């Protein structure tokens, strides 16, 4: 039995994760963490009324020796300290929160390696999204002119999405940086061409009704290729989260990307 703590249990992904953990025979919901709530037990929240797990509002309350895996679906401003705390206390981490900076990830990897603890930071837990990133990396070897469009619900706090950034990073591994478009082009409206990552443009859309979607557009002389992925329900991410929780204890390093476990 894997004892799991969920941080960010009141968010959309945290909500789904609580139910996934509670309904998985291999996992035990050992607690939840949120520093700004008043509840003492998850069963005080209507949608979790049939569950029983303590709510921790301070790191000092958490029985670190009784927690095997820390799942984090919080907010960009909180995730670094959460993951640092877990790794320093030799708790494996499964992180879906976006917003970690490259230098923070480097530091967290060092902590994980020092303590021999496994961890996963996944920009996306959807299998289709992982496949999109791998397909895009392969395509970029032959079609290096590329732009990325990511589309999410209008409550998402960060832009571009972690999935889009990771897609760009994977493409950059096989593609030499070069200027796309007309070198003399100008923007009549600031930001019209989107964000720029090593010569690739990334465009972010935020609209109600969307969940998580991405398109990677490749162009070459006389042809074009579009790779698209759609997540219509957050339930689609739970297969990847469960896989990560089950496997992460077998590792002694912090990794980025669900593909490392597949």
Swiss-Prot record:
<dbReference type="GO" id="GO:0016726">
    <property type="term" value="F:oxidoreductase activity, acting on CH or CH2 groups, NAD or NADP as acceptor"/>
</dbReference>
<keyword id="KW-0220">Diaminopimelate biosynthesis</keyword>
<comment type="similarity">
    <text>Belongs to the DapB family.</text>
</comment>
<comment type="pathway">
    <text>Amino-acid biosynthesis; L-lysine biosynthesis via DAP pathway; (S)-tetrahydrodipicolinate from L-aspartate: step 4/4.</text>
</comment>
<dbReference type="Pfam" id="PF01113">
    <property type="entry name" value="DapB_N"/>
</dbReference>
<dbReference type="GO" id="GO:0005829">
    <property type="term" value="C:cytosol"/>
</dbReference>
<comment type="function">
    <text>Catalyzes the conversion of 4-hydroxy-tetrahydrodipicolinate (HTPA) to tetrahydrodipicolinate.</text>
</comment>
<dbReference type="GO" id="GO:0051287">
    <property type="term" value="F:NAD binding"/>
</dbReference>
<feature type="binding site">
    <location>
        <begin position="122"/>
        <end position="125"/>
    </location>
    <ligand>
        <name>NAD(+)</name>
    </ligand>
</feature>
<dbReference type="GO" id="GO:0019877">
    <property type="term" value="P:diaminopimelate biosynthetic process"/>
</dbReference>
<dbReference type="InterPro" id="IPR036291">
    <property type="entry name" value="NAD(P)-bd_dom_sf"/>
</dbReference>
<keyword id="KW-0520">NAD</keyword>
<feature type="binding site">
    <location>
        <position position="153"/>
    </location>
    <ligand>
        <name>(S)-2,3,4,5-tetrahydrodipicolinate</name>
    </ligand>
</feature>
<protein>
    <recommendedName>
        <fullName>4-hydroxy-tetrahydrodipicolinate reductase</fullName>
        <ecNumber>1.17.1.8</ecNumber>
    </recommendedName>
</protein>
<dbReference type="InterPro" id="IPR000846">
    <property type="entry name" value="DapB_N"/>
</dbReference>
<feature type="active site" description="Proton donor">
    <location>
        <position position="156"/>
    </location>
</feature>
<feature type="binding site">
    <location>
        <begin position="96"/>
        <end position="98"/>
    </location>
    <ligand>
        <name>NAD(+)</name>
    </ligand>
</feature>
<keyword id="KW-0028">Amino-acid biosynthesis</keyword>
<dbReference type="InterPro" id="IPR022664">
    <property type="entry name" value="DapB_N_CS"/>
</dbReference>
<keyword id="KW-0560">Oxidoreductase</keyword>
<feature type="active site" description="Proton donor/acceptor">
    <location>
        <position position="152"/>
    </location>
</feature>
<feature type="binding site">
    <location>
        <begin position="162"/>
        <end position="163"/>
    </location>
    <ligand>
        <name>(S)-2,3,4,5-tetrahydrodipicolinate</name>
    </ligand>
</feature>
<dbReference type="Pfam" id="PF05173">
    <property type="entry name" value="DapB_C"/>
</dbReference>
<keyword id="KW-0521">NADP</keyword>
<dbReference type="GO" id="GO:0009089">
    <property type="term" value="P:lysine biosynthetic process via diaminopimelate"/>
</dbReference>
<keyword id="KW-0457">Lysine biosynthesis</keyword>
<dbReference type="InterPro" id="IPR022663">
    <property type="entry name" value="DapB_C"/>
</dbReference>
<dbReference type="GO" id="GO:0008839">
    <property type="term" value="F:4-hydroxy-tetrahydrodipicolinate reductase"/>
</dbReference>
<keyword id="KW-0963">Cytoplasm</keyword>
<dbReference type="InterPro" id="IPR023940">
    <property type="entry name" value="DHDPR_bac"/>
</dbReference>
<dbReference type="GO" id="GO:0050661">
    <property type="term" value="F:NADP binding"/>
</dbReference>
<feature type="binding site">
    <location>
        <begin position="8"/>
        <end position="13"/>
    </location>
    <ligand>
        <name>NAD(+)</name>
    </ligand>
</feature>
């Amino acid at each position: 039995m894997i004892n799991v703590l969920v941080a960010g249990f009141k968010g959309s992904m945290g909500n789904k994760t609580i139910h996934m953990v509670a309904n998985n025979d291999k996992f035990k919901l050992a607690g939840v963490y949120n520093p700004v709530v008043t509840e003492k037990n998850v069963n005080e929240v209507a949608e979790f009324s049939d569950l029983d797990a303590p709510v921790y509002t301070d790191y000092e309350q958490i029985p670190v020796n009784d927690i095997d895996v820390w799942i984090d679906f919080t907010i960009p401003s909180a995730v670094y300290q959460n993951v640092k705390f877990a790794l320093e206390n030799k708790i494996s981490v499964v992180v879906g929160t976006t917003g970690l900076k490259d230098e923070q990830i480097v530091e967290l990897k060092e902590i994980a390696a020092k303590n021999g603890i496994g961890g996963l930071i996944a920009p996306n837990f959807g299998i289709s999204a992982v496949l999109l990133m791998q397909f895009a990396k392969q395509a970029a070897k032959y079609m290096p002119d590329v732009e990325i469009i990511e589309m999410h619900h209008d409550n998402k706090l960060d832009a571009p999405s972690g999935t889009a950034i990771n897609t760009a990073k994977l493409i950059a591994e096989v593609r030499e940086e070069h200027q796309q478009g007309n070198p003399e082009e100008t923007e009549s409206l600031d930001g019209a061409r989107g964000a720029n990552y090593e010569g690739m443009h990334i465009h972010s859309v935020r609209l109600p009704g969307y969940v998580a979607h991405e398109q990677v557009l490749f162009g070459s002389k006389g042809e074009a290729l579009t790779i698209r992925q759609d997540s219509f329900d957050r339930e689609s991410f739970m297969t990847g989260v469960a896989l990560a929780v089950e496997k992460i204890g077998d590792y002694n390093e912090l990794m980025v990307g669900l593909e490392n476990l597949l």
